[in-house]
Amino acid sequence: MIMAKAAAQKASAPTIDTALLAKLTGGLTDRKTIAKIGADIGHLYSEFLPDTFHSETGIAIDVEYIGSESGLMTDLIANVGQNVAVADCSLRNWCPNFMMAVGNGFVIALMERMLGASPDSIGDPDERNLSHIELDLAAMVLGRIAGVLRSGVNAPGGFEATIDPPFNANGKSAFDEMIAGLYGVTIRMKIDIGKVSSEFSLIVPQRPLLKTSIVAPKASAQALKKQEEWMDMISQQVKRSQVTLEARIKLETLTLRTISRLVAGDVIPFQDLKQDDIGVEVSANGSKLYNCEFGKSGDRYMVRVKNNVSTDDEILRHLMG
């Protein structure tokens, strides 16, 4: 009887509100403080990320602070949207479980720029998940975003941020259990590359943020070295990526009068039809790469490479623009 009464009293005991408990223990703050922290980090990114990105890639971007939002970490992560790549991140002596997200549109547009497309030719990409190579590029982008954050929060020890491999929004975070019940902040930034406008987000538990003083980073003396490292990593990705090739075969010279009278079914011979092989020029991104010969193997037409027009390094530079 006594045990039953004690159990009933325990069941009826009031439970403390989770938000109130978080406030009392330093895990949740007011809107004004959140707005100040968000604006400070937003200013850090808008001031330093474009210069850092340009010095390491040679590509210009614009970054602008959008706003911040407070809430449970699980809710904030669910609200980043579907057209993003997400990564679990940590920074020793600062925060073991924050997350970053970058819009897929920015990554796709950046990949096109790396492969030689001009800024004016790149429009808003279709909404889709990123491929494996695009996720690799997203990791590099998030690494630069994390680098600016690291320099601003000034965590003791000067450690670099750890970024797990990014995943598409339908993936699963390794932090799900760790962040359950934690309150956090989403800091949203607009990021433009050419005509493509996208976003990236920083989702951080409030507890480490409330202990952080944002400071402007010092100019890096390693910019050139980082640029070389960046280009080397992109080069490796390009070597493993698929690039659309174009083959051009010269046709027999015709008069303007003849060309104007061509109709469906007319045949135009190759210019080199009388030679042993038919010459083909293979190019990518408007740059001539190989001299080839045209032929047939079984039921398939194909070209055979005869010689390089450029060196391997020149070919790679053509493909990267």
Swiss-Prot record:
One of its GO terms (biological process) is chemotaxis. Transmembrane segments: none annotated. Its main location: membrane. Disulfide bonds: none annotated. One of its GO terms (cellular component) is bacterial-type flagellum basal body. The keyword Kinase does not apply. It is found in: Cell inner membrane; Bacterial flagellum basal body. Keywords: Bacterial flagellum, Cell inner membrane, Cell membrane, Chemotaxis, Flagellar rotation, Membrane. It holds the Pfam family FliMN_C. InterPro entries: CheC-like_sf, FliN-like_C, SpoA-like_sf. It is a peripheral membrane protein. The keyword Nucleotide-binding does not apply. FliM is one of three proteins (FliG, FliN, FliM) that forms the rotor-mounted switch complex (C ring), located at the base of the basal body. This complex interacts with the CheY and CheZ chemotaxis proteins, in addition to contacting components of the motor that determine the direction of flagellar rotation. PANTHER family: FLAGELLAR MOTOR SWITCH PROTEIN FLIM (PTHR30034), YOP PROTEINS TRANSLOCATION PROTEIN Q (PTHR30034:SF6). Belongs to the FliM family. This is Flagellar motor switch protein FliM.
